[in-house]
């Protein structure tokens, strides 16, 4: 879960918070469903997905519509992200796919195999 009560997030509008969570979820979805890789546990993905759904539900609808990826995530319910990449514009899909590749490469280069296994299997029994 992202703590928006700290700097610089403290001053973000709801649309900015929503856009931030949307981008993270899209990047992790591309990484998982299209690149067959992951750098976050299922539990973490679920927590930020539910945080996004709650924020979208409680904020003003006009504010929600201002979010960057509203057009692709207007009906996101937190259950799965498999279809999100296919909803993106060509430009956004290429841009976020590049980010996903970079994030995974950086994560892999900065962690050991043991650290990666521990991170991906946080709060689960056995390995995925």
Which positions does each model-derived feature cover?
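Phosphate/adenylate-binding "loop-and-lid" substructures adjacent to NTP/NAD/dNTP-binding pockets
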Residues: 1-128
